[in-house]
């Protein structure tokens, strides 16, 4: 069964809040994800905050959700979110709340958090929104637990994200939850972005943790390592991929990532091993071969070192 992502397009919608997550999901579908994207609105014709008319699509009341589907709520201009038209739309608010209670996951991008808060969904829930609106969100809805200076939050099937670009980060995070970190990496690479995480995450994927730099040669090497982790790693070969001498490559790699090449390879192997261990059909020797190790003993040693640290 496909996981459905239904975007609720409100009047004065912010186009980037809509387009960023939608395109990210589309790229995931192109890579084979069993996702389905749908759209609904509140009026016959919605006009975006930038003046783009969006012709009639399905009214939200016509949408039927399944447990595990996602309701995506892009941000809209505050003039609409503070309007009587929105505040008095009890049909919309009751619909959103009922969907959440049925097991649908709700996800707001930017000022879309005000919609969830108006429905009461964010009561006693950690959440965030655009940095210019966090104080306003907390003041208007004092039961919320607004978090500052983070990209996104996740609690009890409720996802909220900060500014425009963080909607892409949140969508990549959801894709990773559903399809795994390597699949999310492929989508991020297709979009020419590298995933970032919020400070509340207990565990950050090592596929992305050391990508907070702009050196194209080092990114190219990191891509190669991730995609070829089952192969033997040769420092000279990696330096060639980066287009550098070995000495210069090892120096620049550590400067840009904050970690040595060998330690980075080890981190990627650990993460891959943890993913493979979830598959009961894979033997330890098979797992070893999948991450470029020679034996089950090497796998155990690697994971024991990880626990000791």
Residue positions per predicted region:
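A short beta-strand/loop micro-motif in the catalytic core of glycosyltransferases
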Residues: 106-107, 127
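Acidic/polar active-site rim loop that often engages polyanionic ligands
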Residues: 115-120, 168
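Basic phosphate/pyrophosphate-binding loop/patch that engages nucleotide-derived ligands
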Residues: 120-121, 180
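Extended, subdomain-level signal for the structured scaffold at the beginning of enzyme domains
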Residues: 1-106, 115-117, 176, 185, ...
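A conserved active-site-flanking secondary-structure segment within enzyme catalytic domains
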Residues: 122-150
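Predominant activation on well-ordered alpha-helical scaffold segments within soluble catalytic domains
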Residues: 19-22, 138, 169-172
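Conserved anion/nucleotide-ligand pocket segment
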Residues: 150, 154-192
């Amino acid at each position: 069964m496909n996981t459905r992502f239904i975007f609720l397009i409100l009047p004065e919608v912010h186009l980037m809040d809509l387009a960023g997550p939608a395109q990210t999901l589309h790229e995931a579908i192109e890579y084979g994800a069993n996702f389905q994207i749908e759209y609904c609105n509140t009026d016959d014709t919605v006009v975006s905050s930038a003046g783009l008319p969006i012709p009639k699509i399905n009214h939200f009341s016509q949408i039927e959700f399944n447990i595990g589907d996602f309701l995506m709520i892009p941000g809209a201009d505050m003039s609409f979110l503070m309007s009587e038209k929105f505040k008095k739309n009890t049909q919309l608010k009751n619909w959103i709340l009922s969907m959440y209670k049925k097991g649908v996951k709700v996800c707001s991008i930017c000022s879309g958090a005000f919609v969830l808060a108006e429905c009461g969904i964010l009561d006693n829930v950690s959440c965030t929104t655009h940095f210019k609106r966090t104080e306003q969100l907390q003041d208007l809805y004092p039961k919320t637990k607004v978090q500052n200076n983070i990209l996104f939050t996740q609690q009890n099937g409720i996802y909220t994200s900060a500014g425009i670009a963080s909607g892409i980060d949140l969508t990549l995070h959801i894709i990773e939850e559903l399809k795994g970190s390597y699949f999310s990496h492929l989508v991020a690479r297709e979009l020419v972005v590298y995933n970032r995480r919020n400070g509340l995450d207990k565990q950050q994927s090592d596929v992305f943790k050391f990508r907070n730099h702009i050196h194209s040669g080092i990114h190219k090497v990191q891509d190669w390592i991730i995609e070829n982790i089952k192969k033997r790693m040769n420092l000279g070969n990696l330096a060639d991929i980066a287009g550098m001498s070995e000495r210069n490559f090892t120096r620049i790699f550590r400067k840009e990532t904050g970690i040595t090449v060998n330690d980075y390879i080890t981190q990627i192997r650990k993460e891959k091993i943890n993913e493979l261990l979830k598959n009961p059909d894979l033997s330890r020797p098979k797992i070893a071969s999948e991450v470029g190790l020679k034996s089950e003993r090497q796998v155990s040693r690697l994971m024991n070192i990880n626990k000791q640290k």
